[in-house]
Each structure stands twice: as structure tokens, then as C-alpha cells.
């Protein structure tokens, strides 16, 4: 799908490339800022990636480590928590490869003087029920306000938040850290902070309360019905992402424009019991051709069977230095 910044660009007026003055103002007033790197932060990284692209070393764990950490270390972080994903929707699909990457990242970052840990999280199914740009922003706001919270997203989000409290030495006890993260989410503070951040970075002051009126919607929506009754056995997460790209919600080439309105919502999780014809998901498209292609892609990505499958926990392992 689109990148994180493409999703935030769905918000009218929001700037993902603020100057240092606005960046500092946002952090001071809101407490956080979701922004992109500037051209002068680890500028050599883009050159190295260009070389990797033509030398078949894009998947080199050592060079991936250098690329990821160059930006983090250059920013001068006091501590760092990494979410290293594995599974059919992750860059490193194989668990052992992902674990090797996580261990390398943690070892190098700690060696450079930044207190770092990593959580390994499962992407053998979508983390949330939405995939796209504006639809994911809506999903995130609904998550923050409590209008709708996908269970796997809640587990991973709270685990990462708690880990950050521990690694930054704000809270020594992991159980207490998790409780504090839970209170911030369910007490509404997280939604308030997000709303302040959006406003300081140029978005609407009432975005959290009225996000539905600000986010662009695709002109066509259609449900994808289950072809038979049964439990969801597996989901090809990468195929769902590719379907969003084909809708226009991601880039095939760097110069491609992103359609923020398109995407897929209502994605049923692994283990869900469905009747024949019950919606597996809803496709939001710009035209009929893209709509039908995405509906087929979603059907092809899902496997149903009579027996309920074993489900996995979303946070598989914690990697420490």
C-alpha cells in the first residue's frame, strides 16, 4: 500500500515535511510528530540504496541495518523500539530471517549508544481491518476514539507503547507500562494528542471529531461476499496490499500519484466464521474495472474451510541487546 506519509497526506492541510521550527513546535505542543525525513538527514542513504538496487543486495541484512539505523541514529534518539515484522505481508517473510534482522538492528543500535529493543510481530494476516490511505486514517482515528478497535492492532500498539515506556526508563515494570499505555488509549489522551498534532501540523482543529467529513471517499464501493460458508483459514496479506496498489492506493513507480480515497475495509480476520455471501471485505474504487479486479484479488487472497484454524498471537518475541 502507500507509505505512512501517504496515509497522513490524506488529511487536508497536514504537512509531512515541516521545517525544523514547526517540527519543534509540534513536539513541544502536542508531544509527538508523524513526519518524513528531510533531505539532509543521512543523505548518503539514498545513494547506497541506488547501489544496492543494481548489485542485487537490496535484501542484505547488513545493508538494511545500515539504512534503517543511519536515519534513527542521525536524529539523535535517546532510545529506540523497533517493530520487526515477519510473515506473508512482511518484507522479511521468513521468521528466522526477520529474527536475524531484529538481532542485528538491536546489536548495532545499542553498540552505537542508543538503548534499543525490538518486538517481532506477525504479518501473516492484516494487522487491521482496513488497507489503503484515507481508510487507514479513519481506522486509526476510530481506534484512538474507541469507535472501532481491531484486536490485533490493539495488542501490537499497546505492546509497542509499553516497550517504549520501559526502554526510555519512564516505567521500570513492564506490567505497569502496559497499564499506563492502556489508560492513555482508553482514557482518551491518545486521541487528544493525535488531534493536537494534526492541528499544529496544518490539519483541521476538529479532525478527530469530524474526520469522516474531511477524508476523501472513493465513488464506488462494493462488498466481497464469501463464496462458501466456513472459517477464514489463511490470508495472503501481500496480495491484499498489491490489490490496494492496483486500485491506485500505492505506487508501482516512484513518480506515480497516490489516490488517497481508494482501499479495502472490513477485512475479516483469520478464524472468523462466515456464512455464504457474508462480506469478507468492502472494496472502495475509482472505476468499475479496478473495482472488479480488486474484488477478485480479495477472494483469491482468502482461504475458507469448515474447521476453525489455530490462531497466532500478534507479538511473537522480544529482542533485547
Q: Residues of each region from the PLM?
A:
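Glycine-rich tight-turn/loop motif centered on a GG-T
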Residues: 7-17, 51-58, 91-95
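Short linear loop/turn motifs
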Residues: 19-29, 42, 211-215
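Aromatic/hydrophobic pocket-lining residues that form π-stacking "cages" and hydrophobic walls in ligand
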Residues: 23, 68, 105
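Well-ordered secondary-structure scaffolds
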Residues: 57-60, 64, 74-321
